UniProtKB/Swiss-Prot annotation:
Residues reported in the UniProt entry to bind FMN: 64-69, 79-80, 86, 108, 143-144, 188, 198
Reported cofactor(s): FMN
Keyword Oxidoreductase in record: yes
EC class (word): oxidoreductase
Organism of this sequence: Pseudomonas putida (strain W619)
Protein name per Swiss-Prot or TrEMBL: Pyridoxine/pyridoxamine 5'-phosphate oxidase
Cofactor: record remark: Binds 1 FMN per subunit.
Origin superkingdom: Bacteria
InterPro entries: Pyridox_Oxase, Pyridox_Oxase_CS, Pyridox_Oxase_N, Pyridoxamine_oxidase_dimer_C, Split_barrel_FMN-bd
Subunit structure: Homodimer.
Pfam families: PNP_phzG_C (PF10590), PNPOx_N (PF01243)
Length: 215
């Protein structure tokens, strides 16, 4: 390593986040920030990439990067194999946290809340707009399970291709969406000298309460 980890840092120099810039509820601000990220972030950064954290039945945390695939006034939607490790963890503990980080904008958004499955129709609607290879992969891959080799996985894909050679694959019952229903959303804007701006929204008694947190 050519540089000490202790010496690795960058200073943040973009504009701050004042209460006057923030609406009373968080979804409008998220939409604004997300639109900024789509316009500003460049590959390899994906604006809709997020880290999803879950906790299993033994209280052990797990995290991974996923893509946000839906957003409305109910919450934030992602899709996966329901039999996967994350699916089993959400079955045992239906709460999760997700984090978006947009480095070019020096912004981060943290979201916490309860998670529920979307309707089968919502899952099928998204499944049908996926590329064919991804739709076949949802059938072929026993996600999170141990497999013998890459060749074994490719064999499963070929078998799935043969199965659906004369028909379009439909959405499997073990695959679909989850929606995180936010109870807390924090907007973080990097500032100089690590004195960052943090505006936190909490869902309290049926409405959003906004507060500033110390950096």
């Amino acid at each position: 390593m050519t540089q000490s980890l202790a010496d690795m840092r960058r200073d943040y120099t973009r504009d701050g986040l004042a209460e006057a810039q923030a609406p009373g509820e968080p979804f409008a601000l998220f939409h604004q920030w997300f639109a900024d990220a789509v316009k500003t972030e460049q590959p390899p950064v994906e604006a809709n990439a997020m880290t999803l954290a879950t906790v299993d039945g033994d209280g052990r945390p797990h995290c991974r990067v996923l893509l946000l695939k839906g957003l409305d006034d109910r919450g934030f939607t992602f899709f996966t194999n329901y039999d996967s490790a994350k699916g089993q963890q959400l079955q045992a503990n239906p709460y999760a946290a997700m984090t978006f980080f947009w480095p070019a904008l020096e912004r981060q958004v943290r979201i916490e809340g309860r998670v529920e499955k979307v309707t089968p129709q919502e899952s099928d609607d998204y499944y049908q707009v996926r590329p064919l290879g991804s739709r076949l992969g949802a059938w072929a891959s026993p996600q999170s399970r141990v497999i013998a080799s890459r060749e074994a996985l490719e064999g499963l894909v070929k078998a799935t291709e043969a199965r659906f050679s004369d028909t379009q694959p439909h959405c499997p019952e073990h695959w679909g969406g989850y929606r995180l229903l936010p109870e807390r959303i924090e907007f973080w804007q990097g500032r100089a000298s690590r004195l960052h701006d943090r505006l936190n929204y909490r869902w309290v008694d049926g409405q959003w309460a906004r507060e500033r947190l110390a950096p």
